[in-house]
Amino acid sequence: MAGDTGRERKNNRETGSHYERVAGAYLEQEGYEILEYNYRCKTGEIDIIAKEAGYLVFCEVKYRTSDKKGHPAEAVNPAKQRAISKSALCYMTVNGIDEIPCRFDVVSIENHKVILYRNAFDYTG
């Protein structure tokens, strides 16, 4: 963010990583197999990549400490959905995956409450 110091960016990354691990633990309890955290490619980043019930699942993790900025899942707007979709395509291409159905889930964490939205949005290229 503009105006953030290096320390603030580091703290934000650490906080984000913490909540991604919380989300990952929750997903494992729900039967997901975590394949990767923080996948990065030229088109963007995916917080968690997992397998569940025969699907390759691309998960976006959103957290809030209060509702002042709205519900966490609301932050996954159409632009974010496109970026995640492109990154998912990149992951599948790089890894030679084309025969596995995939879906996009959102994990919302607000005040320590975890909510999973399966199939939260469709691929948007």
Q: Which stretches of residues belong to each language-model region?
A:
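Acidic-basic catalytic patches of nuclease active cores, encompassing PD-(D/E)XK
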Residues: M1-Y37
